[in-house]
Amino acid sequence: MSPMMRALQHANYTFAKKISHTADSQDQRHRMIPGSRPLLTLADTREPDYITPALLQENPRGKEVYERAMQDAWYAKNQLLARGVPQEIALYLLPNAKSIRLVESGSLLHLLHKWTMRTCFNAQEEIYQSSLDEIAQLREVHPQLTKHIGPPCHLRAGVTTPICTEGSHFCGVKVWLDFPNVQRRI
């Protein structure tokens, strides 16, 4: 690591997040950005507490089916608890859409790597949006840094080719022309 890059280890940021269990599991791939996650047994709710994917938000029939499935999952879990099944067993019924609230902290060096990977249009939608939210919070305290943050194509444009590092998985959108103001369509 170059001496200039080492300085990025000294700037640290902390974010409070609410994401689905699925997104949290994927987000944990960035091991250098640790998070404090609650035990599911301590964060259990009687009422459904889940994340709805953007794709379903835009589809009334799909959203209706999805919400019914969430209601059914929590109802079944609550029925098991009422019948004396241990909580750690009953929680197996909860879907991966269950909301997880956590606090995550990391150095600017490691967050830059995460944001580069997770602001690409090929990133999972929920993690993409979470990364944009984190960058927006960073912009409030250190606006001068955010021009150096974005997907690989944003960082490589005008510097090297190919601009997109995804090869045959190129999303087809020239994100680098107007990041972060570009619209992501699902």
For every predicted segment, state its role.
Residues 1-186:
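A conserved ligand/cofactor-binding region detector
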